[in-house]
């Protein structure tokens, strides 16, 4: 660790199709941090064990990917390194595991937000184009996504860390440079102000 300071942990959250992976990878590049994506880990596992036969099997692969993600993040943070972790973490469900790694770090949450019609359109377009790995079975899960959006499961996580909500409907609001500045700000700003971009 640098001067006794905790390492930086950036958690990138939001619904499928909200732009998390693109933003998370860009943040990791700008901050020179490793990028840990649950979906990328799930795809790597799927390449070895095969495409799941149904949604429950796909979900089991997702749980395995989460185990790898949290294990890798823990090792990196315990060694004093920072990381960017990205997934469609669910409010009211994902917080317990995240709090374990948050306790090891100077953690910040970047939550990607887009209007539900935008999310559903992007979600459909990417699997129709064949952009998504078959391990995700996206075509079979569109109905579940609509339900999750309506339920609020993809609202910002309850982690009591500094939180920035980034609107991704048309580019980034706030802009990328402002997002990076938020992440580079000094630690010790208190527990979890939620900053929402005004359009």
What feature does the model see in each segment?
Residues 5-9, 81:
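Pre-Walker A (Motif I) flank of P-loop NTPase domains
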Residues 61-106:
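Glycine-rich phosphate-binding loop used to anchor ATP phosphates in small-molecule kinases
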Residues 128-176, 197-199:
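Small-molecule kinase domains that catalyze NTP-dependent phosphoryl transfer to phosphate-bearing small molecules
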Residues 19:
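Conserved glycine(s) of the Walker
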């Amino acid at each position: 660790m640098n001067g006794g300071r905790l390492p930086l942990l950036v958690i990138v959250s939001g619904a499928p199709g909200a732009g998390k992976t693109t933003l998370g990878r860009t943040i990791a590049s700008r901050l020179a941090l490793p990028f840990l994506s649950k979906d990328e880990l799930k795809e790597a596992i799927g390449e070895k064990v095969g495409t799941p036969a149904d949604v429950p099997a796909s979900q089991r692969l997702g749980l395995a990917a989460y185990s790898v993600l949290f294990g890798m993040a823990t090792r990196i943070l315990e060694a004093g390194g920072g990381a960017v972790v990205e997934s469609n973490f669910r409010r009211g469900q994902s917080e317990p595991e995240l709090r374990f790694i948050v306790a090891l770090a100077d953690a910040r949450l970047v939550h990607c937000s887009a209007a539900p019609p935008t999310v559903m359109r992007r979600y459909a377009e990417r699997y129709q184009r064949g952009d998504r790995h078959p391990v995700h079975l996206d075509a079979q899960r569109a109905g579940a996504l609509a339900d999750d959006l309506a339920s609020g499961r993809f609202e910002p996580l309850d982690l009591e860390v500094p939180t920035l909500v980034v609107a991704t409907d048309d580019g980034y609001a706030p802009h990328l440079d402002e997002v990076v500045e938020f992440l580079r700000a000094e630690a010790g700003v208190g527990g979890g102000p939620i900053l929402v971009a005004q359009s």
